[in-house]
């Protein structure tokens, strides 16, 4: 593991390209509705029940990382949160992702999940969270 000397984030690869920002998690959560905050913390707690997951605020999103980054909160709406799970293959046979898109020029498929209620973290979503975690901790 490599630790950035400027921001103290840890990465699998030395000199990993990233944005050293002074953003804090509170910068993203400030001014959000109680409902949105409850959704965010429920998602974070659900991931932490799976394994040791760190939360990394970046310039424009909130990353969740095991050994590598395994999920991203890309938007905190008024009554929802948008989450992306990056996988190396597309998992089309599901009911939870409203969009699956390949990142151009890569073998990464972003799986988009919109969470409106705490109950949206159902068994299917938990199975993808567990998969993301397992892939993250076993990455090279």
Predicted features and spans:
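Charge-dense, helix-prone N-terminal extensions
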Residues: 1-140
